[in-house]
Curated annotation (Swiss-Prot):
Bilayer topology annotation: Multi-pass membrane protein
Chief location bin: membrane
Cell inner membrane as UniProt keyword: yes
Lineage, highest ranks first: Bacteria, Pseudomonadati, Pseudomonadota, Gammaproteobacteria, Enterobacterales
Keyword list, A-Z: Cell inner membrane, Cell membrane, Membrane, Transmembrane, Transmembrane helix
Pfam families associated with the record: DUF697
Name of the featured protein: UPF0283 membrane protein YcjF
Keyword Transmembrane helix: yes
Compartments, record wording: Cell inner membrane
Gene: ycjF
GO cellular component, one term: plasma membrane
Amino acid sequence: MTEPLKPRIDFDGPLEVDQNPKFRAQQTFDENQAQNFAPATLDEAPEEEGQVEAVMDAALRPKRSLWRKMVMGGLALFGASVVGQGVQWTMNAWQTQDWVALGGCAAGALIIGAGVGSVVTEWRRLWRLRQRAHERDEARDLLHSHGTGKGRAFCEKLAQQAGIDQSHPALQRWYASIHETQNDREVVSLYAHLVQPVLDAQARREICRSAAESTLMIAVSPLALVDMAFIAWRNLRLINRIATLYGIELGYYSRLRLFKLVLLNIAFAGASELVREVGMDWMSQDLAARLSTRAAQGIGAGLLTARLGIKAMELCRPLPWIDDDKPRLGDFRRQLIGQVKETLQKGKTPSEK
């Protein structure tokens, strides 16, 4: 049997017309533009840094302002006046044979000499910290360079600054992997993948250790003053150790720039301590809730310490981050939570027995 024909269907709207896609006009690049071409990354989510990250940048990065130049000029003029007055006093004491005043002038000269030596030493350390930023820019240029001859000397200088011996296995592997036909980009990339991770691993261990100690100390300490002093000491020590690992010796002025961030960390610990004490007394929570609050407070302080260590590691490191090898705060967070849980479980086990 044949199926009956379906009735006709009339549509009111017009038929859709195929729309041809519109393309932009062709653009031709010359040879120089083609070599420097880099694809743009669209909708790239920026890493969440927060206000603490901005404070770190402001603390670790050297600042120059008109007021600072005026203060430095005034100090230099005052120092010159002190030296001139000291010379005049010395001449008068010698002419009048005032030996007591002459001894005082000699003691003052020794003190001034020690002060000048300290200023020169601090300036040299500050200059070394600024040179590290220039070395990082140079490494970034070499990672995009197709020339030859500069990469090996640059990497050998970095290894010498970091105190890596020529017989180190990582450095020997790097020497065995490079040859004369490789350009600067390949040589520096090999150094970044073979030698630099040795120092990065040591810095990560220092960050983990300091963050864990800060977390556990705050989680078990009942005194806010002890927490604040402990965090200050641990953070300053962490910065010094990371800088030493990368071949940088921090001076007094460099520590002053970092002290603002340390104060932020201390303020966090002290404020959270006050909130915990007032909240617990007001709400009359049990011991378990008190331990949970202390653990959360300790983890927060430990994460701030880890964030400080990551930023110090980034600014003391001679090479830029490549291939997403930058340490993430989430890695330290998981480790800190695991350590706090383990510590609390060990503390509950004897009490239950």
